[in-house]
Amino acid sequence: DDLPDSIDWRENGAVVPVKNQGGCGSCWAFSTVAAVEGINQIVTGDLISLSEQQLVDCTTANHGCRGGWMNPAFQFIVNNGGINSEETYPYRGQDGICNSTVNAPVVSIDSYENVPSHNEQSLQKAVANQPVSVTMDAAGRDFQLYRSGIFTGSCNISANHALTVVGYGTENDKDFWIVKNSWGKNWGESGYIRAERNIENPDGKCGITRFASYPVKKGTN
């Protein structure tokens, strides 16, 4: 496949500033929203910060601040006819009752797709088109204390944290993923981690290839 050697969706205007999930286990909502914000900008040209809190409160297939997955959240957005802006359903960082009275979707998606797992080339192909939701093992000390550079620290592959891959590249012959986290701008490289890419394990760094998925958007909102 003829894929670009590198891509950074931040430079293409498809990524809103890094957010902070706080003490709520809502990483799945942030991962989902970042992917939807991305494809919406790519398709429509508009970059709109969208509502994680709506997903936390309203995605009944997930568990709010106690965890969840991206695919049921994508499916909620499909079924709901879209997702609210951050402005109209702001983040509170705690579980809440779904507020249907403020339901005013501004961005819709058509469906979602899973990236073929255990294959970094499949993930690269997807990320060449748009930001992609992924899981990583973020429980280890090395990950949590990451500051900068290409992350080569130790981690396993358990899917305990959700993030969004917003690009990839190579530095000094070392390939990396550009991954957006939701732990605020003071963590890592201004809220991002560059994780080593094209490693020998098909699960990818910290299991990044295991549960990757992305929203499909065909037209306007």
UniProtKB/Swiss-Prot annotation:
Enzyme class: hydrolase
Coiled-coil residues: none
Keyword entries, A-Z: Disulfide bond, Glycoprotein, Hydrolase, Protease, Thiol protease
Disulfides per UniProt: C24-C65, C58-C98, C155-C206
Active site: C27, H161
GO molecular function: cysteine-type peptidase activity
Pfam family, one: Peptidase_C1
Protein's UniProt keywords contain Metal-binding: no
Gene Ontology biological-process entries: proteolysis
Glycosylation sites (chain numbering): N99, N156
Swiss-Prot/TrEMBL catalytic activity: Preferential cleavage of peptides with a proline residue at the P2 position
Entry EC number(s): 3.4.22.67
Stored PANTHER family: CYSTEINE PROTEASE FAMILY C1-RELATED
Family of the protein in this entry: Belongs to the peptidase C1 family.
Role description: Cysteine proteinase with a specific activity toward peptides with a proline residue at the P2 position.
Name this polypeptide is given: Zingipain-2
